[in-house]
UniProtKB/Swiss-Prot annotation:
Organism listed in the record: Shewanella sp. (strain W3-18-1)
Biological or metabolic pathway of the protein: Glycan biosynthesis; glycogen biosynthesis
Subunit organization: Homotetramer.
Gene designation: glgC
MF-aspect GO terms: ATP binding; glucose-1-phosphate adenylyltransferase activity
Name of the protein in its database record: Glucose-1-phosphate adenylyltransferase
CDD domains: ADP_Glucose_PP, LbH_G1P_AT_C
Length: 420
């Protein structure tokens, strides 16, 4: 669809609802005190910034963020970083916490989270409603799926991408389509996904991003709310119940720009979170955070620049192949192939390699850290060794992932918890 005016009309007629209430239990202690969408990513961002930036860059300027699990840091971040939109100009980013609007229950599932906000959506008078997952890192121009939805005459459109069968098993909804991308079958998180017809090692997976005609969405949500056996979930209940009698289409995920590789990461495990951050260190990463054509917006703290001090023979403050964010001080220490978030301090004679270090961490002298995720606010005692011997890491109370990434949190170090 090349008609810019047509696309701009579609985005103006759309209300986006970002589902950001999930914990992300496969991240273990990393989400003990924050929802997965509030988790840090890429040196200065949080995961929620990516779907929000996609909305703004796509021209979708009316957005609701649905929150539930341990949402304080998420709400605070959205208020600080996304509260500048003008309602009188048709722009808004609103926070929609679970508040028992229609029953005594909190949000029971993805469909129920939308159903409990029907009155808020109706007040916006949108022609289309986008329901978006708030816990993935990706770049997507939502104008494309909106145009495809309108052109096909669909009641619902599901954004999808090809995923290896081994990766999809038990993790993603799996779609079957005909030659016109009409959905013929949908199974939520099967243990044995059906392969794509042209590639037996891949399957077509739902991204958890949907476009609905507004009235059609309301009808299906009301019907589902009256079904006592429903799990109140789009993947488990809504989609399987409508594909036979209604027009439900799949939309292949693509980059916002021609001839560029599409980027999407689940970051739902410690290993995938670590790996996705490490990928950013490439000279030409698949996700280019420096691409001004598709900026990622976030809350910007007023912090001084990063500083590297000491140039002695036995201690030299330096960072190589790394992302080092504002407020960091590398004091006579060495950082290699690592992502350091705001206000991290690495003290003399310490070495940090192949690690993701979240904000406000202090690494004291003579520490050696590699292949690790260090959670926010940790103070690593002098002489601590992390990531070199997994048995020793476990004996200290740290968690070691399936692929050998060591997670360290404040609780594991005996420090007060409740940080976010």
């Amino acid at each position: 669809m090349s008609n810019v005016r047509y696309i701009s009309n579609l985005t103006r007629e759309t209300y986006a609802l970002i589902l950001a209430g999930g914990r992300g239990s496969r991240l273990h202690e990393l989400t003990d005190w924050r929802a997965k969408p509030a988790l840090y990513f890429g040196g200065k961002f949080r995961i929620i910034d990516f779907p929000l930036s996609n909305c703004i860059n796509s021209g979708v300027r009316r957005v609701g963020v649905v929150t539930q699990y341990k949402s304080h840091s998420l709400i605070r971040h959205v208020m600080r970083g996304w509260g500048h939109f003008k309602k009188e100009l048709g722009e808004s980013v609103e926070i929609l916490p679970a508040s028992q609007r229609f029953s005594e229950n909190w949000y029971q599932g993805t469909a129920d989270a939308v159903f409990q906000n029907i009155d808020i959506i109706r007040h916006e008078l949108p022609k289309y409603v986008m329901v978006l997952s708030g816990d993935h890192v990706y770049r997507m121009d939502y104008a494309g799926i909106l145009a495809a939805h309108a052109e096909s005459g669909a009641d619902m459109t599901v954004s999808c991408l090809e995923v290896p069968i081994a990766e999809a098993a038990g993790a993603f909804g799996v779609i079957e389509v005909d030659d016109n991308m009409r959905i013929l079958g949908f199974e939520e998180k099967p243990q044995r996904p059906k392969p794509s017809p042209d590639n037996p090692e891949m399957c077509l997976a739902s991204m958890g991003n949907y476009v609905f005609n507004t009235e059609f969405l309301f009808e299906q949500l009301k019907k589902d709310s009256q079904n006592a056996t429903s799990d109140r979930d789009f993947g488990k209940d809504i989609i399987p119940s409508i594909i036979e009698k209604h027009n439900v289409f799949a939309y292949p995920f693509k980059s916002p720009f021609p001839n560029e590789q599409a980027y999407w990461r689940d970051v739902g495990t410690l290993d995938s979170f670590w790996q996705a951050n490490m990928e950013l260190l490439s000279p030409t990463p698949a996700l280019n955070l420096y691409d001004a054509k598709w900026p990622i917006w976030t809350f910007q703290e007023q912090l001084p620049p990063a500083k590297f001090v000491f140039d002695d023979d036995d201690r030299r403050g330096m960072a190589l192949d790394s992302i080092v964010s504002s407020g960091c001080i590398i004091s006579g220490a060495t950082v290699r192939r690592s992502v350091l978030f705001n206000e991290v301090r690495v003290c003399s004679y310490s070495v940090v390699e192949d690690s993701v270090v979240l904000p406000d961490v202090v690494v004291l002298r003579h520490c050696k850290i590699k292949n690790a995720i260090i959670d926010r606010g940790c103070i690593i005692p002098e002489g601590t060794v992390i990531g070199y011997n997994h048995d020793h890491d476990r004996a200290k109370g740290f968690r070691v992932s399936e692929k050998g990434v060591t997670l360290v949190t404040r609780d594991m170090l005996g420090l007060p918890v409740g940080y976010e």
